[in-house]
């Protein structure tokens, strides 16, 4: 059963049981970190292609974290916010840019987060030394 396309009754039943929700969407401890990283990378690809909006990352993070155990949620959080980057060991300077911050989302749902977009735009890029 796909919880996104299932009947209202089925979705309601799954919403009452996080364990059932996890089974329905196929989310396990092993896939939580992978899905978080894939979610981040999809947002990077979208923004670097010119879609200057980070709200998809925000909403998908909220949807996918539902039903995770605390331990699994920590791994998902770290990977979906890009907290675990790989640094070049030879780099003289390292800057960690992470993403996700609701940025007035409650007051203006149509507004994306400029700092989130900037984090996504610069992911994986190297700055030249001056």
Regions found by a protein language model. Give the residues of each.
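N-terminal catalytic or cofactor-binding beta/alpha core of small enzyme domains
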Residues: 1-130
């Amino acid at each position: 059963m796909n919880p996104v396309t299932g009947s209202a009754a089925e979705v309601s039943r799954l919403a009452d049981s996080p364990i059932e929700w996890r089974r329905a969407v196929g989310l396990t401890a092993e896939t939580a970190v992978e899905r978080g990283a894939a979610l981040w990378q999809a947002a990077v690809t979208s923004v670097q292609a010119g879609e200057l909006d980070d709200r998809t990352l925000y909403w998908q993070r909220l949807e996918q974290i539902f039903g995770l155990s605390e331990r699994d949620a920590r791994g998902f959080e770290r990977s979906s916010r890009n907290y675990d980057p790989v640094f070049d060991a030879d780099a003289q300077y390292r800057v960690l840019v992470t993403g996700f911050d609701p940025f007035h989302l409650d007051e203006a749902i149509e507004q994306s987060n400029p700092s989130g977009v900037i984090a996504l735009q610069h992911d994986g890029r190297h700055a030249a030394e001056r």
